[in-house]
Amino acid sequence: DALPIFYKDIKDVNLATKVFDLSVNMGSNWAHRLVQRALRATGQDILEDGILGPITLAAINKADLTDLLAALKSEAAGYYRTLAATKPKRAKFLKGWLKRAYA
């Protein structure tokens, strides 16, 4: 029960924990955008607006969670790779970020 109330509407605790972890690290807007991108990657027609509202939550809860979690990890890794490429001073953190993305 350590997850904020905001993420308790995600039925799968592993996915909720992952989204929460990403939101702590990169901010909730980016974490929510990556979830929405992952939903799109798994075939769901969802708007990428960074809002974890009822439409996104419903899409999350009806998704194949194994596929969605894999897609979310991939999206997070892509985010971190882009961040390291565009901000070279942060590239030293890439290895740790990728471990976090795929955890």
Predicted feature locations:
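Low-complexity, Gly/Ser/Thr/Pro-rich intrinsically disordered linker/tail segments
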Residues: T66-A103
